[in-house]
Amino acid sequence: MSTSSVATSDNATLDFSKLVPFSNSSDFHPYCLISDYNNQTNVEQCWLGDQFLPLADLDTENPSIVSTMNNWIQGLVKSYGIDGLRIDTAKHVRKDFWPAFAKAAGVFTMGEVLIGDVGYAAPYTGVFQVMLCKL
């Protein structure tokens, strides 16, 4: 699962009203593609994808977004009896988002941080029970 982005075919014509429950452009970070993977703010607040298929990036600094995400994962886990989550693209969301999200889920969490730098990946070990990274 990825909690940070929503696929779109074209940023210029994106109709946010169709993206339920995040149906306002203010629910997302302003459009910018990630250009510097050494800049954590750029990684967390710019969009994944490319000019042909940009992935709108949720504003996970917004308390309303955080609350909605936490309620959503709690309900999803309960409804489907999920016993563990693999969270892809974890480095694209601020680290302090994840503890409350994992607590709301109430199940085993495995975070994916695709990077070959142990120093960069190490802080995520305190966030998730298991880490996947490229070494």
Where are these regions (language model features)?
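Core domains of carbohydrate- and sulfate-ester-processing enzymes
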Residues: 2-51
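Active-site-proximal helices and loops of the catalytic beta/alpha 8
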Residues: 5-17, 71-135
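Flexible, active-site-adjacent loop/turn segments at secondary-structure boundaries
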Residues: 20, 50, 56, 112, ...
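Active-site-adjacent "subsite" loops/lids of carbohydrate-active enzymes
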Residues: 35-80, 90
